[in-house]
């Protein structure tokens, strides 16, 4: 009985295995049928009962049971199934979950729209401009790594035609894509001022949009801060953020310690100015030979030591002689400046004399056939060949004339290696107004000289006052530096020239010759003091001479005054006026004009004593060879090899 039971149980297990295999095959067959039906079905979509919103789902076999096709005019119940249902309760579950699915679909749709908007915004504004380093960087955010691909859609060359892309492919110096708006602004930059974000008149830099206010406030802060204060505000790197090095920490410039050292060096320079000449000291060279002499009186050992140093002593004596010779050479080569103790220079005259004593010594020592005064208020490098030609023309006509050039801007020995070296009597002196204007109505100008020299037309007004005072105190001839002397001036007495102008005739002080203590010059000095105007250019010069001359000649002592003032026509001193002088700097191209200029050249040489080339009008012009002006400049040259 037990055996029969055991045999049954063995067959029963086999039967169970067979049944399991059959069920497994049935399940696989059913699953295969479902999959085959799913692959042949149309793309899965689900439209809600309200038919207002459509939600897209990814293709998956897990949602294949929810594929429902809605008819055009049917309601919620008018749906047809295209496939068999696994469970007969699917209808009930689906009907009960319609409302839940609608809510879930609406939430999913809103989330998907937010994601799309977020991706779109990220693709258009995923970069920002780093003002510190001057480059474009990627903005930091908390998006998923799967969404990073959206960043580069805007820079794709083969982009779609949707028009949502806000920029195209463009790369800067650091190979970073640039936004289209940035490139559009860069194209509008046309000047350096625009690149530096400066305001030039009404024009505003296009790069100032957005952060121009910050730029102005930052520059204002740097200007107000004492540490970064500067006189050059606009283009100073300490005040202009666009000119600062973005890789540096803070602002570059002098620290407070550097400023202290700079101030100390400036004080040292003020204590020992360049114009002050310090004699070289040779004290150390003189002491050592004396020590060797002392060694000879101390014993045999000392004597032996002295013998071994005899050669060194000879070398040191030679060095001492070289130092003395170099010192003498430096005295010759170094320039001399007016420093309050020296007022003029001429070889053979003590340089430490006062201004009046220097002038008297210069005129007394040299046998002067004529005293000539000139004024030069420009830097020495501006004394060009054409001005040199004026002085040469004077010295060629008057070889023994004593010329004094009054100047505040050139060295006292400015002509030492030129005219003085050639034995011409030319000296440079800085006027001491306190001595020059003494016993004249204009002496008050000496006390206000420091404030007077700050006025706009000081160089011109200073020259006009000095020429009147020098002629009144010493007597002689005054010439402007742009006057060429064509004939002898020895016959001139109390003479001034008329200037021919379009608006009318007036006197011109470029050429004047007066005796010492001239009454006319005294009237001019008094008029200068009474009517001085620091804002008028000609009021204290040509206009002043014209006013005083009319009053002087129409006064009570008419006959006597005519002897004290002789007015010559414009053809004597100014044959060509300032309005026409520029026409004679060019060589005429037509034969008729050349012949006309040749006739004018001969006529001026015969009738005129001077030729004025009006440097205030023609300073920027260069006379062409064989032009009328070039002929007059080279007519009486001494150093003719110097090129104009």
Curated annotation (Swiss-Prot):
Acidic residues: compositionally biased ranges: 89-114
Regions crossing the membrane: none
Chain segments carrying region Disordered: 65-117
Signal peptide coordinates: none
Pfam hit, one: Gb3_synth
InterPro entries: A1-4-GlycosylTfrase_dom, GlycoTrfase_DXD_sugar-bd_CS, Nucleotide-diphossugar_trans, Put_A1-4-GlycosylTfrase_plant
Identification of the protein by name: Uncharacterized protein At4g19900
Organism of provenance: Arabidopsis thaliana (Mouse-ear cress)
């Amino acid at each position: 009985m037990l055996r029969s039971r055991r045999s049954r149980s063995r067959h029963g297990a086999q039967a169970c295995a067979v049944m399991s295999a059959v069920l497994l095959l049935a399940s696989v067959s059913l699953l295969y049928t479902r999959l085959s039906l799913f692959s042949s079905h149309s793309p899965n979509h689900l439209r809600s009962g309200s038919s207002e919103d459509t939600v897209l789902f990814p293709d998956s076999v897990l949602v294949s049971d929810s594929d429902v096709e809605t008819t055009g005019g049917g309601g919620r119940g008018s749906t047809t199934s295209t496939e068999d249902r696994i469970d007969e309760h699917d209808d009930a579950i689906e009907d009960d979950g319609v409302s839940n699915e609608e809510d879930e679909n609406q939430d999913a749709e809103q989330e998907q729209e937010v994601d799309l908007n977020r991706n779109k915004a990220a693709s258009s504004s995923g970069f920002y401009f780093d003002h510190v380093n001057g480059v474009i960087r990627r903005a930091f955010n908390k998006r998923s790594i799967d969404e990073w691909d959206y960043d580069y859609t805007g820079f794709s060359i083969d982009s779609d035609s949707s028009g949502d892309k806000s920029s195209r492919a463009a790369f800067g110096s650091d190979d970073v894509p640039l936004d289209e708006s940035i490139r559009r602004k860069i194209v509008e930059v046309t000047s350096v001022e625009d690149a530096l974000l400066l305001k030039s008149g009404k024009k505003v830099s296009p790069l100032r949009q957005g952060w121009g206010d910050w730029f102005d406030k930052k520059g204002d802060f740097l200007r107000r801060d004492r540490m970064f204060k500067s006189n050059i505000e606009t283009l100073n790197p300490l005040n202009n953020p666009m000119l600062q090095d973005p890789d540096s920490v803070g602002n570059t410039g002098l620290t407070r310690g550097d400023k202290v050292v700079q101030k100390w060096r400036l004080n040292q320079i003020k204590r020992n100015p360049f114009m002050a000449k310090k004699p070289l000291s040779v004290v150390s060279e003189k002491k050592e030979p004396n020590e060797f002499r002392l060694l000879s009186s101390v014993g045999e050992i000392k004597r032996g030591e002295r013998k071994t140093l005899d050669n060194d002593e000879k070398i040191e004596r030679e060095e001492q002689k070289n130092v003395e010779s170099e010192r003498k050479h430096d005295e010759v080569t170094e320039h001399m400046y007016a420093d309050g103790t020296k007022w003029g220079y001429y070889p053979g005259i003590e340089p430490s004399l006062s201004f009046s004593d220097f002038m008297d010594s210069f005129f007394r020592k040299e046998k002067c056939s004529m005293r000539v005064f000139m004024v030069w208020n420009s830097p020495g490098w501006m004394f060009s060949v054409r001005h040199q030609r004026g002085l040469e023309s004077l010295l060629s006509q008057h070889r023994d004339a004593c010329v004094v050039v009054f100047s505040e801007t050139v060295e006292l020995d400015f002509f030492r290696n030129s005219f003085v070296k050639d034995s011409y009597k030319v000296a440079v002196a800085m006027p001491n107004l306190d001595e020059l204007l003494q016993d004249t109505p204009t002496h008050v100008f000496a006390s206000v000289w420091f404030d007077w020299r700050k006025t706009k037309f000081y160089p011109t007004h200073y020259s006009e006052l000095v020429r009147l005072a020098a002629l009144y105190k010493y007597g002689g001839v005054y010439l402007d530096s742009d006057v060429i002397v064509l004939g002898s001036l020895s016959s001139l007495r109390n003479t001034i020239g008329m200037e021919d102008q379009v608006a009318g005739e007036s006197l011109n002080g470029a050429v004047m010759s007066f005796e010492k203590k001239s009454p006319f010059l005294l009237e001019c000095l008094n008029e200068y003091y009474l009517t001085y105007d620091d804002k008028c250019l000609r009021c204290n010069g040509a206009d002043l001479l014209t006013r005083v001359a009319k009053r002087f000649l129409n006064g009570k002592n008419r006959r006597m005054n005519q002897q004290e003032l002789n007015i010559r026509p414009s053809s004597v001193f100014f044959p060509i006026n300032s309005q026409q002088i520029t026409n004679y700097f060019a060589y005429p191209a037509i034969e008729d004009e050349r012949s006309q200029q040749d006739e004018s050249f001969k006529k001026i040489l015969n009738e005129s004593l001077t030729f004025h080339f009006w440097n205030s009008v023609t300073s920027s012009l260069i006379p062409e060879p064989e032009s009328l002006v070039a002929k007059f400049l080279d007519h009486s040259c001494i150093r003719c090899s110097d090129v104009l």
